[in-house]
Amino acid sequence: XYAFGINGTXRI
C-alpha cells in the first residue's frame, strides 16, 4: 500500500 504523509510522500 501506500500512505501519504503531511509532506505528500508516499511510503510503500
From Swiss-Prot:
Organism, as annotated: Ochromonas danica
Enzyme Commission number: 3.6.1.1
Sequence similarity: Belongs to the PPase family.
An MF annotation (GO) of this entry: inorganic diphosphate phosphatase activity
Highest taxon of source: Eukaryota
Binding partners and assembly: Monomer.
Keywords attached to this entry: Hydrolase
Chemical reaction(s) catalysed: diphosphate + H2O = 2 phosphate + H(+)
Protein name: Inorganic pyrophosphatase
